[in-house]
Amino acid sequence: MKILRKNHPLLKIVNHSFIDLPTPSNISSWWNFGSLLGVCLIIQILTGLFLAMHYTSDTTTAFSSVAHICRDVNYGWLIRYLHANGASMFFICLFIHVGRGIYYGSYILSETWNIGIILFLTTMATAFVGYVLPWGQMSFWGATVITNLLSAIPYIGNTLVEWIWGGFSVDKATLTRFFAFHFILPFIITAFALVHLLFLHETGSNNPSGLNSDSDKIPFHPYYTIKDLLGIFLLLMVLMILALFFPDVLGDPDNFTPANPLNTPAHIKPEWYFLFAYAILRSIPNKLGGVLALILSILILAAFPLLNTSKQHGLIFRPVTQTIYWTFIANLLVLTWIGGQPVEYPFTTIGQIASITYFTIIIILMPVSNTIENNIIKL
């Protein structure tokens, strides 16, 4: 078997990626979230496949088909809630994974980092089109509001929106194409994830110390396979607790009402994992400015390798930037909270301050703190 896994054309790839892969001996539990994202993706594809067998992408029957899945299909309620809460677990792991990358300076591996940003955007797109499918009130109005933002693009905006809708409003054509997108995008994510891994294994993994670990590598199996299995067990435990005890805690009550184009909900808001970006969008009074800020809130991640001027790798020995980093995390939580609040004083003002702080920390404060720390080293 030892010879087979090293010589077989297919098993050789698996062997070099997951068994004999030389791995730094000191990577912590923060490095577990890559494998957890892989598990989340598998769970989402499998549960989604079973849901797609019973779902109908028609405006007249979509809401009823989701109710039918929950009531009449064997364990349909479980599959549906595993899928809905699995998306939340996916984004929790994704945010921690990106946060770890920023903290430990993983953006130095620029190819891996840039593919990661594409993965992040693709996952957000998948979650957005998926949220429209149950065809509840928040699904319908969320789709209307977010797709309508494209009308802010000069000259081609209105045409583009009608092209995406497949008509003059969000209707049957929109739901059908969103279902098609939601079905195909996870497989595109899987392909990008493989490319992400390919680039990572070209350079080798980063480690908490930020130092070169070539002299101290251990095989991935059994050390990190066991460690990953523990992480997977904990992830599944949290997911099952969510799905079985608190299935609707992260959802929106408005989505229990079928979509009605004639009745607008009091507060239109997306799922919790988009609230930070939604708060940034709402904090700018101009429509086009808001859309640009929304896009930049994610694309600014690509600036990290360019703005990094530090002579040290990661933040583990950099107290000044550490303080700024944790301020940034706190600011993200404030943005998430503001995104779920109504558009009125004082929430709008807090949102504007938090949005300015978000970009200021990344573009100005972090590079400045890097320079300060570089000068401290010289003393």
Curated annotation (Swiss-Prot):
The molecular function terms of the Gene Ontology recorded here are: metal ion binding; ubiquinol-cytochrome-c reductase activity
Q: Which UniProt keywords apply?
A: Electron transport, Heme, Iron, Membrane, Metal-binding, Mitochondrion, Mitochondrion inner membrane, Respiratory chain, Transmembrane, Transmembrane helix, Transport, Ubiquinone
Q: Which InterPro entries match?
A: Cyt_b/b6_C, Cyt_b/b6_C_sf, Cyt_b/b6_N, Cytb/b6-like_sf, Cytochrome_b, Cytochrome_b_C_euk/bac, Cytochrome_b_N_euk/bac, Di-haem_cyt_TM
Summarize subunit and interaction data from the UniProt record for this chain: The cytochrome bc1 complex contains 11 subunits: 3 respiratory subunits (MT-CYB, CYC1 and UQCRFS1), 2 core proteins (UQCRC1 and UQCRC2) and 6 low-molecular weight proteins (UQCRH/QCR6, UQCRB/QCR7, UQCRQ/QCR8, UQCR10/QCR9, UQCR11/QCR10 and a cleavage product of UQCRFS1). This cytochrome bc1 complex then forms a dimer.
Q: Which SUPFAM superfamilies match?
A: a domain/subunit of cytochrome bc1 complex (Ubiquinol-cytochrome c reductase), Transmembrane di-heme cytochromes
Q: What is one cellular component GO term in this UniProt entry?
A: respiratory chain complex III
- Chief subcellular site? mitochondrion
Q: What is this protein called?
A: Cytochrome b
User: How does the UniProt record describe the way this protein sits in the membrane?
Assistant: Multi-pass membrane protein
User: Could you list the residue ranges that cross the membrane?
Assistant: 33-53, 77-98, 113-133, 178-198, 226-246, 288-308, 320-340, 347-367
Question: What job does the chain carry out?
Answer: Component of the ubiquinol-cytochrome c reductase complex (complex III or cytochrome b-c1 complex) that is part of the mitochondrial respiratory chain. The b-c1 complex mediates electron transfer from ubiquinol to cytochrome c. Contributes to the generation of a proton gradient across the mitochondrial membrane that is then used for ATP synthesis.
* Positions with a binding annotation for heme b b562: 83, 182
A GO BP term here is: mitochondrial electron transport, ubiquinol to cytochrome c
* Positions annotated to bind a ubiquinone: 201
Cofactor(s) needed: heme b
User: Which organism does this sequence originate in?
Assistant: Akodon siberiae
| Leftover remarks | Heme 1 (or BL or b562) is low-potential and absorbs at about 562 nm, and heme 2 (or BH or b566) is high-potential and absorbs at about 566 nm.
Which protein family is it in? Answer: Belongs to the cytochrome b family.
* Entry-linked Pfam families: Cytochrom_B_C (PF00032), Cytochrome_B (PF00033)
State its location(s).
Mitochondrion inner membrane
As to how many cofactors bind and how, the note says:
Binds 2 heme b groups non-covalently.
